[in-house]
Amino acid sequence: MNARIPPSVLNAAHTLSQVSTLWDDQIVPQLQDYIRIPAKSPMFDADWAANGYLDTVVRNTAAWIEAQKVSGLVLEIVRLPGRTPVLFFEVPATKVGSTQTVLMYGHLDKQPEFTGWRNDLGPWTPKIDDGKLYGRGGADDGYAAYAAIAAIQTLKTQNVPHPRIVGLIESCEESGSYDLLPYIDVLKTRLGEVALVVCLDSGAGNYDQLWLTNSLRGMASGVLKVEILTEGVHSGDASGLVPSSFRIMRQVLDRLEDSATGRLLPASFHCEVPADRLSQAKATAAILGDEIYKRFPWAHYDCGGATAFALPTTTDPLQALLNRTWLPTLSVTGADGFPEMKNAGNVLRPYTAFKLSLRLPPLVEAAAAVQELKALLEDNAPYQARVTFEGLSSATGWNAPDTASWFEDALNAASQAHFGAPCGYVGQGGTIPLMNMLSKGFPAAQMMVCGVLGPKSNAHGPNEFLHIPYAKKLTAAVAHVIAQFP
C-alpha cells in the first residue's frame, strides 16, 4: 500500500502532468501567437508606442492570465507616462502566518530579427520541430509569465499552502530595463517583503537537470564614431595623405583591447573570481566538458579532405566557463559609414562608426566603467580626428547571495523529482538588470534565477528556440521550490 502524500506536499508526478497539459493545450498556442508579433524592445523600435506591439503582447498575456481564474489573483497593467508598460499581479498567501513574498519576474519585449534564419524558419513565424518552438522571443522571455501562472495553478489545485506571490513582467529588458526602476519605485509598497525571487530569464547548461544561475555579467553599449572628413573623397587622390577613419578606429580600439588575445586592457574592468564561484565552475566544467564550446555553430571548411573548424579562445572547460562569465569582453555588434558592397566605389569614407557591446564582470560597476570607457576612447585622438562615444545603455552585473540551506535542499529535490539529477550551478554571460536592483533592495532574498536558454537555443540570434520538454519540467520545478518555501 502506498503511503498517503500529505496535503502540504506537492505530488511531483501530478505536478508535471498538470503542467504538461497546460503547456500543450494553452501555453504553446499562446506563445505561437506571441512570436508572430514583432514586439521589439524600445532600443530597436523608436516608434514602439505608435506601433503598439508591446502593448499588444502585454494585453494578450494579461487576458490569458485573467482567463485562468487563479484563486485570489489580482492583475493590473501599470502604465507610467512615456514608459513601456508593466504587468503586475498579486496572489495572497494561503500559508498560515506567512508574511513574506515570492517575486516572479519575466519580460515580453524582444530582440530584433537578425539574419541567418534557416530557410524554413523566421523570427515572426512560429514553428514546432522536434519538441522545439522556434521564433523570436519565445524562450527569451515570452514564456515566463505563462510558466509562472502554471506553477501557481498546480499549487492551487493540489491545495499546497504557499506564501504571497507577486509577478512583475516588464517590456524594456532588452533595452537595459531603463523603464523598470521608476515602476519599482511606484510598486515598492505592493511588492512587500521579498524573500524569494524567481527570475525565468536565464539559461541552462544542458537539458538534463535544473540549473541555477549564480552570476550574471554586466554590460555597456554605445556608438563609437571616428570622423576625419566632412564628405567622401576619391581614394586615389586622398589615400596616403588623408588617414583612413577605419585605421584610426583600430588605433582607438587598441587602447581598450589586445586584438591578439581579446583581453581588455583597463585593470578596472576586471575583478577577482570569488572562491565559491570558482569551485562551482569547476564542478560545472566537469559536468559539461567540451560541450561548453562545441555547442556553438562554428564556421568550417574542407582542409585536405578533412573538415576544419574555427576554434574558441580556449578548449579548457573551466577556462571556457570563466571567459564567458567572469572576464570583460568587447563585441562589435553593428557598423555605419560603410556602403553596401555592390555600391562600394573607390571612395575614402568620411567616417566609421561601430556599435560596441561591452560585457563586464559581475562585480564591476557599469556606470563607472562607461565613464572610463568614454575618456579612454575620446581623449587625444590620432590625427586630431573627431572621436565620440555615445553611451546607449548600461547595467551592472550580479553575483548571487549565499544560498540558504532550505533553498539548496529545495533546488536539489526539485531537480531530482523532475529530471532525476541534482541541481547544477552556472554563471551566465548575459545581463538581467533587475537582479542587481533586487539584490540591493532585498539583500536577504534568495534568488532562483533560471531559464530555458540551453545549448543551441540561440537567443538574440537566428533560429532561437524554446525547448518545450525542458520548459515543462522547469515549470514543475519552480512550483516545487515555492512549495518548500519556509
Question: Can you name each region flagged by the protein language model?
Answer:
Residues 97, 206, 264-351, 359-372, ...:
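An extended, acidic, His-containing surface patch that forms the Zn2+-binding/catalytic region
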Residues 162-244:
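Histidine/acidic-residue-rich, glycine-tolerant segments that coordinate divalent metal ions
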Residues 108-109, 256-261, 375-384:
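A common structural junction motif
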Residues 2-116, 351, 355:
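N-terminal helical capping/dimerization or prosegment-like subdomains
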Residues 150-157, 251-255, 480-483:
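Short glycine/serine- and small hydrophobic-enriched flexible loop segments
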Residues 239-260:
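A short core secondary-structure module
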Residues 97-169, 473:
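Active-site metal-coordination/substrate-binding segment of hydrolases
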